């Protein structure tokens, strides 16, 4: 049964059996102070519309129109451009949860229409792997297919919780069903993991929104399958640790590799623990948390001290110049 309660939480662990803190509904807090409210207003009135124009100007939305044969031409931009559309939709959805905005709603609905029309009959959706690259689907796991899917799932859950609409959620569940039909531990399914983690936590949140247990089981599979060298050398140059594929998660004790990927993985594993209560996952996450917060983190909370590979540094290695310290590593956490 779909969770359609009014103004549910951003991350809904209200029915997760192994969590102690319970989220509050979106409308339980009103940030009307002098610090946050002006920034939220700028986000609604300036930032989100500007970003939507950028999605148009850079061809990101045109990639969806091309996939549905509304326009011709070639694919525009880097292979993970779809994810930027989904990230914008997630941000716009949570903004709409604060109150109606006809212009923002128009942009959101327009983007969802292009996404709906671009989806393949089997549920697959990635505009990079359309037409000339359709035969290459699920052949190169360095190309962020599941990463993009995960951001779609999170945008869909956000849109559903913020507006009650199931339009984008229907797209997401069709794609999630395709992934769960294609990948898994069962005979005849693909045993593989994506080079860039993200889908793990997204599948759990999709499970929380829909009650469809196969999505939770899919997240468990991708966590279980990582750490067995399925990726080889990412991008032909990095060690397996770059994508946390060097050792099973339950055996890890040090945070290594690409910081954003690692935190998506750890967050997804924490989500799985919240639903299953698997002690081995919790023990591993506690070790990794201890290592990260006492040996790899800046006093500001920043992570990712190496420019090369946007990676964690060595033990207690936190230079004051040169590191990336991007905001992205903190988002999953």
What are these regions (language model features)?
Residues 1-333:
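Glycan-recognition and catalytic cores of secretory/periplasmic carbohydrate-active enzymes
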């Amino acid at each position: 049964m779909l969770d359609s309660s009014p103004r549910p939480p951003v991350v809904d662990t209200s029915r997760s059996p192994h969590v102690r803190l319970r989220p509050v509904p979106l409308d339980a807090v009103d940030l009307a102070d002098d610090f946050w409210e002006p920034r939220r207003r700028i986000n609604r009135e300036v930032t989100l519309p500007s970003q939507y124009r950028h999605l148009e100007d850079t061809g990101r939305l045109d990639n969806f129109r091309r996939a549905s044969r509304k326009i011709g031409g070639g694919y525009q931009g880097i292979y993970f451009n779809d994810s930027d559309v989904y990230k914008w939709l997630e941000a716009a959805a949570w903004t709409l949860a604060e109150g109606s905005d006809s212009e923002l709603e128009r942009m959101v609905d327009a983007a969802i229409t292009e996404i709906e029309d671009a989806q393949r009959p089997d549920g697959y959706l990635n505009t990079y792997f359309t037409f000339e690259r359709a035969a290459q689907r699920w052949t190169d796991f360095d190309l962020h297919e599941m990463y993009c899917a995960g951001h779609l799932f999170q945008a869909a859950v956000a849109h559903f919780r913020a507006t009650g609409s199931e339009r984008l959620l229907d797209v997401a569940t069709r794609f999630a069903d395709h992934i769960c039909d294609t990948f898994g531990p069962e005979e005849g399914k693909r045993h593989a993991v994506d080079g860039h983690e993200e889908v793990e936590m997204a599948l759990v949140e999709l499970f929380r929104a829909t009650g469809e247990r196969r999505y939770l089981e899919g997240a468990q599979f991708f966590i279980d399958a990582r750490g067995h060298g399925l990726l080889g050398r990412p991008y032909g140059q990095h060690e397996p640790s770059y994508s946390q594929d060097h050792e099973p998660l339950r055996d890890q004790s040090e945070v290594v590799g690409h910081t954003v990927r690692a935190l998506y993985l750890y967050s997804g594993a924490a989500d799985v623990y919240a639903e299953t209560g698997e002690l081995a996952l919790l023990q591993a996450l506690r070790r990794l948390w201890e290592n990260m917060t006492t040996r790899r983190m800046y006093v500001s909370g920043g992570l990712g001290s190496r420019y090369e590979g946007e990676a964690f540094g060595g033990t207690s290695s936190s230079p004051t110049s040169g590191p990336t310290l991007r905001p992205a590593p903190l988002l999953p956490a």
